[in-house]
Amino acid sequence: MKISGVDIRPGNILEYEGGLWRAAKIQHTQPGKGGAYMQVEMKNLIDGRKTNVRFRSAETVERVRLDTKDFQYLFADGDMLTFMDKETYEQISLPKDLLGDAVAFLQDGMDVVMELYEEKPISVQLPEQVEAEIVEADAVVKGQTASSSYKPAILDNGVRVMVPPHITAGTRIIVDVNTQEYVKRAD
């Protein structure tokens, strides 16, 4: 479906110069001279490249709708990850690169949402928050309790996060997958 430059919104998938791009940041600019345009920061869904493109309000671009399917993560085999379609029980293997930094939070049996374009997997969306265990945390320095200071800690998957002073090794916490930040203590 074709949309004009001013109708582009964050999260839209656009077909641009032969590739699929996800619009990330968008800024409407109206210079003193000349017509208004949308400055769009986009990320290529295939290779991860980022680019900035100006779309004039009169320009049109193809907005693509991706199909989504529920999958379950099964196992890793080298650089490949294997998922199972929850409806048909078919298995599909994808490269780890497709998940980027989020691959560290992938857990056996985790339910994920796969985005498909013309039946080909484009991206894998993990749950927004996952539970992880602290394996190492710095000790609290006396007198730091008055301010909201955070200390570094290492999770069971090797990811380093900043946590409140009361969190110790062995504590289970909830982590935001996208920002890789501490959310709260797990119940």
Curated annotation (Swiss-Prot):
GO biological process, one term: peptide biosynthetic process
Compartments (UniProt record): Cytoplasm
Gene Ontology CC entries for this record: cytoplasm
CDD domains: S1_EF-P_repeat_1, S1_EF-P_repeat_2
Disulfide bridge map: none
Pathway terms, separated by semicolons: Protein biosynthesis; polypeptide chain elongation
Key words of the record: Cytoplasm, Elongation factor, Protein biosynthesis
A single GO molecular function term of this UniProt record: translation elongation factor activity
Record-linked Gene3D superfamilies: 2.30.30.30, Nucleic acid-binding proteins
Protein biosynthesis keyword on record: yes
Chief subcellular location: cytoplasm
Database matches in InterPro entries: Elong-fact-P_C, NA-bd_OB-fold, Rib_uL2_dom2, Transl_elong_fac_P/YeiP, Transl_elong_KOW-like, Transl_elong_P/YeiP_cen, Transl_elong_P/YeiP_CS, Transl_elongation_fac_P
PANTHER family: ELONGATION FACTOR P (PTHR30053), TRANSLATION ELONGATION FACTOR KOW-LIKE DOMAIN-CONTAINING PROTEIN (PTHR30053:SF14)
Similarity comment text for this entry: Belongs to the elongation factor P family.
Function: Involved in peptide bond synthesis. Stimulates efficient translation and peptide-bond synthesis on native or reconstituted 70S ribosomes in vitro. Probably functions indirectly by altering the affinity of the ribosome for aminoacyl-tRNA, thus increasing their reactivity as acceptors for peptidyl transferase.
Listed name of the protein: Elongation factor P
